[in-house]
Swiss-Prot record:
Binding positions (Mg(2+)): E257
Cofactor: Mg(2+)
E.C. designation(s): 6.1.1.20
Major subcellular site: cytoplasm
Cofactor: how bound: Binds 2 magnesium ions per tetramer.
Keyword Aminoacyl-tRNA synthetase: yes
InterPro entries registered for this protein in UniProt: aa-tRNA-synth_II, aa-tRNA-synth_II/BPL/LPL, Phe-tRNA-synth_IIc_asu, Phe-tRNA_ligase_II_N, Phe_tRNA_ligase_alpha1_bac, Phenylalanyl-tRNA_Synthase, tRNA-bd_arm
Protein name: Phenylalanine--tRNA ligase alpha subunit
Length: 330
């Protein structure tokens, strides 16, 4: 009986080792483990015969059975490790990046002419000591008109059509509204540049758009004069357009007094580029500033107009068409 069990154990080990060696997946290896070493596995079935052995024979068979079990466990662990390593190696081989292969070509983008114009203008004003200020595009009537010396019955309201919202608010018609917000929150002296989108009910054509961009500057301090305003604008124009002739023409804006428009001589003709003036005392009073102590000046211009002049664009609508043939020129 002893020799029979020894033979069965040796045959089991030989068969199991061969099967483990041939296993090519972790699932197949687990199936072999259950088949040979599980509670109902082949080794357990053989060991059931130990009950028929004499007490003196059992230690020998038990020791042999443990040797077989340990050999199979070691074989299973080694094979499992080998399969894991092979899987990792295969994955690495499949995911290896050949750095000598050409990459996917991604064409370089271009800065939109509106963005480049805004960036250039703001860089100039920041260099002059101005702070960038932002404000909401949806405004109240107070900030867009009344605080800027334009009450409901003021005739200047007829100068521009406005997009009114159902709740009584409106889409701002100029970035001048930003100066009111800023002055309410800051004590003078102040110097700000306020860029942003504006909205007016204009009929779109080659020079007008319902949505456009504007930059407004504001300076408030003791002793500021129109000479300071002219000097600031001259420096700005020179850095934007170069050494070109400029002229100031008397004009009217409800929130500045006196007011002026500025023209530059460009390509042999005069072009209007911005409006400016000294801040009206009523505007200063509306934000709690004493106009007897402080004076200020403001200027504003349309970014689209500047971009069209700088890049010789003949139609404002080209700036919004997303035509790559046009945009790739910049």
């Amino acid at each position: 009986m002893t020799s029979d069990l020894e033979t069965q154990l040796q045959q089991l080990q030989t068969e199991a080792v061969a099967a483990i060696t041939s296993a090519d997946t972790l699932d197949a290896l687990e199936t072999l483990r259950v088949s040979y070493l599980g509670k109902k596995g082949q080794l357990s079935q053989i060991l059931k015969g130990m009950g028929k052995l004499d007490a003196s024979e059992r230690p020998k068979i038990g020791g042999l059975a443990n040797q077989v079990k340990e050999a199979l466990q070691q074989g299973l662990e080694q094979k499992k490790s080998d399969l894991n390593q092979a899987a990792i190696a295969a994955q690495l081989a499949a995911e290896t990046l050949d750095v000598t292969m050409p990459g996917t070509y991604i064409p370089q983008g271009h800065i939109h002419p509106l963005n480049s114009t805004i960036d250039k203008a703001l860089d100039i004003f920041v260099g002059l000591g101005y702070t960038i200020a932002q404000g909401p595009e949806m405004e109240t009537d107070y900030y867009n008109f009344e605080a800027l010396n334009t009450p409901p019955d003021h005739p200047a309201r007829d100068m521009q059509d406005t997009f009114y919202l159902p709740d009584g608010n409106l889409l701002r018609t100029h970035t001048s509204a930003v100066q009111i917000h800023y002055m309410e929150d800051h004590e003078p002296p102040i110097r700000i540049a306020a860029p942003g989108r504006c909205y007016r009910r204009d009929t779109e054509d080659a020079t007008h758009a319902a949505v456009f961009h504007q930059i407004e500057i504001l300076a408030v301090d003791k002793g500021l004069t129109f000479t300071d305003l002219k000097g600031t604008i001259k420096v700005f124009i020179e850095q934007m357009f170069g050494d070109v002739p400029i002229r100031f023409r008397a004009s009217y804006f409800p929130f500045t007094e006196p007011s002026a428009e500025v023209d530059v001589q460009w390509k042999g003709r005069w072009l209007e580029v911005l409006g400016c003036g000294m801040v009206d005392p009523n505007v200063l009073k509306n934000v709690g500033y004493d106009p007897e102590v402080y004076t200020g000046f403001a200027a504003g211009f349309g970014v689209e107009r500047f971009a069209m002049v700088l890049h010789q664009i003949d139609d404002i609508r080209r700036l919004y068409t997303s035509d790559l043939r046009f945009l790739r020129q910049f």
